[in-house]
């Protein structure tokens, strides 16, 4: 009988660009690893400018690299330094490599970008590969419109890295919802590295740190959240116009603008909120779980993390997905609606107030996600832990056997 060796140190690269998604996903994984492995320590590498706003468990820490911003046209620029993007990436790559050299992880998980931003993780992957460190690429359930992703990965020469460097590809979702690499021409040996873990269940309200903001209503309310908020103004405007249109809404609304919504847009929305009896707003809440727990329904754009929270807290939800610059949210929301997990209201560009008002009136009476039986839907974190433990004992049975098989 083989004794499983537990990794003692995990290093997680959080691809930071636009919004909160990558950081919050990596944080959830880090917390799950230390919760189940008492000797585990985890470092998250991130350039997020607000990573310090989040609480981290004991034995989880972060190294912040110089931040970058992904512009709406897809280009990147330095967040705050007066450096061009090439210099910024060179600094980031050096910090990533040096951290890996000193920390010497037993497991390296790279989030979303196989080679990191502009290839900044490539040298670190090569170095750790030579040391025998297990290397894992973690992917969300939906990446982008398949044809666009195929073109992007071909341009970045990703497939050879998947062949030569990575031991496993963990997909934080289920194949019946989406295969994120469906139209990528992957060699069979790369396909065999793919494992679907299920979605990443979030901390229940009891286990989460206390929210900084008290619930402002003494009756059921709708929580409206665009995630990071950098591209959430259209959804927020639509919801506000619905409340301006409907003088007697059945439920009040709590709006969470998000830390990346532009200040002038927040100020404009806040002025409109002040004129509405049944709407309150806050800028940001790092520990949003208690607010979700108390809500009668959720209105969101349907990013990966919000979708996981909707499933975790079993909330009736209305999803208004963006379609630019990626189709990720639309693909996820459309498939989830087909399964009966959520309802989607597509942004037609007109955004009639009465359409939103009608959808909001019906929202709390919608089915909950738990009304649909999807085996393994929220098994992501237990499977991540099992996979991590097995990777600590290289040479044992194939990893794919642990979490339900390969793609």
Where are these regions (language model features)?
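C-terminal amphipathic helix plus adjacent low-complexity
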Residues: 3, 354-407
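Conserved nucleotide-sugar phosphate-binding/catalytic loop shared by glycosyltransferases and other
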Residues: 7-9, 14, 32-87, 91-93
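Donor-nucleotide binding loops and adjacent catalytic segments primarily
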Residues: 30, 202-297, 349
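Short N-terminal targeting/anchoring amphipathic segment
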Residues: 96-118
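A nucleotide-sugar donor-handling region in carbohydrate enzymes
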Residues: 139-234, 260-263
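A donor-sugar binding/catalytic signature common to diverse glycosyltransferases
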Residues: 287-331
